[in-house]
Amino acid sequence: SLFAPSALVLTVGEGESAADSGVQRAVTLTCTPKASGTHPAARAACDQLRAVDGDFKALVTTKSDRVCTKEYRPIVITAEGVWDGHRVSYEHKFANPCMASDGKGVVFEF
């Protein structure tokens, strides 16, 4: 192939960290050579990742104008695989589902 591979497994779960969270949902996302996988919006997710050059830290936001309760029910999102030929291992914790739904972007909407 002329393209470096971009294939990921993405998860969303409840817990303090990926190591102790129960995975609630998981999808596959392949962006090269074309958007595919079990992700429900593969093309939009790939476009969002390309816009930040695969930098998940730039993709995921924690700032929002949305008002969320202060409940602590942590949500953990992960990305494992390869982006543009480089190994990816990313994990981010949100304090609760409200904050997660606001900050995770299209990539983690599944």
Curated annotation (Swiss-Prot):
The record marks 70-71 as: Reactive bond. GO terms for cellular component: extracellular region. PROSITE patterns: SSI. It is found in: Secreted. Pfam families: SSI (PF00720). Keywords: Disulfide bond, Protease inhibitor, Secreted, Serine protease inhibitor. It comes from the Bacteria. Disulfide bonds join 31-46, 68-98. Gene3D superfamilies: Subtilisin inhibitor-like. One of its GO terms (molecular function) is serine-type endopeptidase inhibitor activity. Its main location: secreted. HAMAP family: SSI. Homodimer. Belongs to the protease inhibitor I16 (SSI) family. This is Protease inhibitor SIL-V1/SIL-V4. It comes from Streptomyces netropsis. The lineage of its organism: Bacteria, Bacillati, Actinomycetota, Actinomycetes, Kitasatosporales.
